[in-house]
Amino acid sequence: MRIGLYPGTFDPVTNGHLDIIGRAVKLVDKLVIGVAVNIGKGPLFTLEERVATLERETAHLTKIAQIEVRPFDTLLMYFAREVGAQMIVRGLRAVADFEYEFQMTAMNQQLDREIETVFLMADPRHQAIASRLVKEIAALGGDVHKFVPPGVAEQLLAKLAK
């Protein structure tokens, strides 16, 4: 069984994330979506909310491949081994992403040479989307419906209204 791992903070999940997930499921028999605890980023949504949102937003893709959404709070390569992943899937939006991902991949290869990293280029419609910017736009009263699924937009607006 080919198992892929798509890790991220997903705070919130964006249309860009979902595009990568939708393409990644076609490459594997099972895709594990690893939701990083990542306390350092100070997430707006709780870990439980992010996991539940991803489960809801990816439910329709289970016809293509098995999907499992799991939180993790360890080194990525340790988590990849734990779930039996042969590949890590990463999305690239711009040159800055490539530089960061190149360095991370080089370090990850030192930890486990058996796990490959596969890069998927972001769809041009989603190249500018970043969770950080979506939160900023929403906080300043902007419309985020073109950047995130409708349910996520509503969650985001409700969270910021508190």
Swiss-Prot record:
Pathway listed for it? Cofactor biosynthesis; coenzyme A biosynthesis; CoA from (R)-pantothenate: step 4/5
Gene field:
coaD
Q: Which NCBIfam families match?
A: coaD_prev_kdtB, cyt_tran_rel
Which terms in the Gene Ontology molecular function aspect does this entry carry? ATP binding; pantetheine-phosphate adenylyltransferase activity
As cofactor, the record names: Mg(2+)
Pfam families (UniProt xref)? CTP_transf_like (PF01467)
Q: What is the protein name stated in its UniProt record?
A: Phosphopantetheine adenylyltransferase
Q: Which family does it belong to?
A: Belongs to the bacterial CoaD family.
